[in-house]
């Protein structure tokens, strides 16, 4: 009987031992290399139990995982270091913890010192934290000393916090790496090390594009200068350069930093150019990014406003009673090419020359004080057109004025060529209009004004220099961008005297204009393209080479009604 009772006890012991063994062999997320090859269950210990039993504890390591495609270019040692940081326990910095400013492999930081000089330290911690927070970097308020005149040797000493908290010492390595980082492993933001690596890389790219500070001369900026794109400056403020005072043994205060490196002023027509006596901390004229005045070094330049990172110059209203026009900027660039060729070649080595036109809202004080410069025949609503246009437009005086102007300006040889072109299409115009009644001619003018009113809404938002003229060449509409491009004012082209499109072209372009118009007047319905024409400006010694696109608009009778010309400068 005793033997019979012992049998179930032995069975229960074996079952318990097998259950405990199964509990010990709990699956892990990542097996070692030996268990991975043998497809055996591994555990979280290193060396694992199976490798201890087989005597392979010396080579028991985590099995390598298959790399993702987007991590193909990342070095393996960097990935392994990042995995170690991801598996480390979370660390909370105490009040009296010491920080060693040593860069970690995946900490959110700006590019290394190979391309960047040190950031000027200042006691504007809140501004710095706020600005860098938008780019994914969150510097601690303890990282910047309150005394900006400390030398690099004294920077390693502890500094007292204004609220009794101890300041961490600053190593000299901070001045070599830019922004500091912790020497203790930080907790990653994502459970996946690959995702954390990806977002850290994106943060570095954002910092490199928006807050990059170049150490040496490179294709990304001027020597030892801080470049900021206008997209990150408040109030669409332009940018200039502030030279970094790197050779001093102590980090100067921010006020001295701005005063010592203040460039010359560009005061051509701009009332916002700052004088040397202006206060750098004037709250109405500046706002801070990384402790540096933005509006100040945007307007303080001896050359026109330019985004040097992309070699783009600014045109249009400057916020005062002055407009920067294309001829003035081109003249200033030519002066820079002659007087300061180093700056000229460096800007052009980064990117091709380009221009951007600024727009000021209608509610701005600059636009409130301006009188509307519109044609007497311009209408606001379609009802005005049908109510006020009660007689046809006479084209005969326009042709007589055009012929008189051509005879006064051009020699006989060119007049003969233009007369041949005019003779090819003018008889057709006369024949078409002879069969029309007065009501038809009134309807033609109503169609012209109604079409011009529709095109006005498109031209205002297109941003392309545009001008509209009648089939006689009389200018009927001028876009704002065309005035910025050429320097002509609307009242000079529309209100004061009758102007023709040929008055804005040079001699060769005028001859080509008549030859081309004679071909498209009763030919191609869509229009034509002048590959190149030269525009005249109010300054007789300044001419602008442009590419011109024509769009021919006909009325309901098939007669050319208006020509819309789009001009873009050839840089």
Swiss-Prot record:
Residues 403-475 form the PAS domain. It is found in: Nucleus. InterPro entries: ERT1_acuK_gluconeogen_tf, PAS_13, Zn2-C6_fun-type_DNA-bd_sf, Zn2Cys6_DnaBD. Disulfide bonds: none annotated. Keywords: Activator, DNA-binding, Gluconeogenesis, Metal-binding, Nucleus, Transcription, Transcription regulation, Zinc. Residues 1-25, 76-117, 141-187, 216-282 are annotated as: Disordered. The keyword Lyase does not apply. Residues 10-21, 239-256 have a biased composition (Low complexity). Residues 20-48 bind DNA. Its main location: nucleus. It comes from the Eukaryota. One of its GO terms (cellular component) is nucleus. GO terms for biological process: cellular response to starvation; gluconeogenesis. Residues 143-180, 216-238, 257-282 have a biased composition (Polar residues). GO terms for molecular function: DNA-binding transcription factor activity, RNA polymerase II-specific; RNA polymerase II transcription regulatory region sequence-specific DNA binding; zinc ion binding. CDD domains: GAL4 (cd00067). Belongs to the ERT1/acuK family. Transcription factor which regulates nonfermentable carbon utilization. Activator of gluconeogenetic genes. This is Transcription activator of gluconeogenesis ERT1.
